[in-house]
Amino acid sequence: MTTVRVKENEPFDVALRRFKRTIEKIGLLTDLRAREFYEKPTAERKRKKAAAVKRHFKRVRSMQLPKKLY
């Protein structure tokens, strides 16, 4: 469980921002959204494989030289 201690004379907004940052860093919200609905194991594998292919092609595309624009 994540805890954020509010310091003396610290505004609530600053403490809330620190809390949100720690929640984002540990990936709690993304994990909760992923577990919100049941996903079949085959669907999960298919989604992860598609994401890996997309990352691969994105990496390959970024390594290519840009086309000449003339």
Swiss-Prot record:
The lineage of its organism: Bacteria, Pseudomonadati, Pseudomonadota, Betaproteobacteria, Burkholderiales. GO terms for molecular function: structural constituent of ribosome. Belongs to the bacterial ribosomal protein bS21 family. The keyword Coiled coil does not apply. Gene3D superfamilies: Ribosomal protein S8. This is Small ribosomal subunit protein bS21. GO terms for cellular component: ribonucleoprotein complex; ribosome. Pfam families: Ribosomal_S21 (PF01165). It comes from Methylibium petroleiphilum (strain ATCC BAA-1232 / LMG 22953 / PM1). Keywords: Ribonucleoprotein, Ribosomal protein. One of its GO terms (biological process) is translation.
